[in-house]
């Protein structure tokens, strides 16, 4: 039961290998196996789903490279009244400058979870499907993917684009190594593939990751579709996240 499972003490509840090591493989595996079920929607049929497809349309405009970056745990805190700031101490000046650009389109994304489940947002954005619609118990959409799926990688790839995915974290986490292959990404790059990564605290910096993305764009021999999930802002969010000597910028909060 969920209550019994959560009653056991583990060294790090957020780190899956630690949970399996502390509770033992058979019990942890059997518990997690029950959370990966996908509910069949009422009235669903494969034939009916195929009728929804309207066919591909190509040649509607100039092919341009598309780069998507999902910044780990990012949120526009200036939207929340709990975080006041002065104009001089705007915590997100670059974001706000981009929003004001007359050529920019901006908006808000509502993600399928809070304080966890990073890969669920990746799944929703790339496939157009919704994690929350899979089942009431699914903890991660990535853990139910086990075959090729249509995604933005395939949409762009079928139109002659090079496609790639970068994540400066472990390839096994959320089974990303396999899932992104099933999504259709031609190239996947993880922390084990990166040369001399730069760290800030425990995690690879966004600056280093941005340099990798820029290099991929410059070296592409065809229009590029690229998706990156960063990691610098990953938990934990303690005062020593970036080391004991890190000086935090002023908040502007009275």
Where are the predicted features?
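N-terminal secretory/membrane-targeting segments
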Residues: 1-63, 85-108, 142-146, 150
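Solvent-exposed soluble domains appended to multi-pass membrane proteins
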Residues: 55-61, 68-71, 76-254
């Amino acid at each position: 039961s969920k209550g019994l499972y959560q009653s056991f003490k583990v060294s790090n509840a957020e780190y899956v290998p630690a949970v399996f090591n502390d509770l033992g493989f058979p019990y942890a595996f059997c518990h997690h196996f029950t959370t990966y079920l996908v509910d069949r929607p009422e009235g669903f049929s494969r034939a009916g789903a195929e009728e929804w497809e309207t066919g591909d349309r190509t040649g509607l405009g100039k092919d341009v490279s598309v780069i998507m970056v999902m910044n780990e745990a990012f949120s526009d805190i200036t939207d929340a009244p709990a975080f006041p700031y002065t104009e001089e101490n705007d915590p997100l000046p670059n974001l706000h400058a981009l929003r004001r650009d007359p050529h920019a389109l901006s908006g808000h994304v509502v993600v399928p979870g809070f304080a966890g489940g990073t890969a669920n947002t990746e799944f929703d954005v790339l496939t157009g499907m919704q994690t929350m619609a899979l089942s009431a118990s699914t903890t991660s959409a990535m853990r139910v993917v086990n075959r090729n799926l249509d995604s933005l990688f395939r949409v762009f790839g079928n139109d002659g684009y090079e496609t790639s995915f970068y994540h400066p974290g472990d390839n096994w986490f959320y089974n990303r190594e396999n899932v992104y292959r099933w999504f259709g990404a031609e190239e996947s790059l993880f922390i084990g593939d990166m040369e001399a990564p730069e760290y800030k605290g425990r995690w690879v910096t966004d600056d280093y990751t941005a340099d990798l993305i820029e290099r991929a764009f410059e070296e592409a021999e065809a229009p590029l579709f690229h998706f990156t999930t960063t990691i610098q802002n990953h938990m934990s969010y303690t005062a020593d996240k970036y080391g004991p000597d890190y000086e935090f910028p002023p908040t502007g909060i009275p």
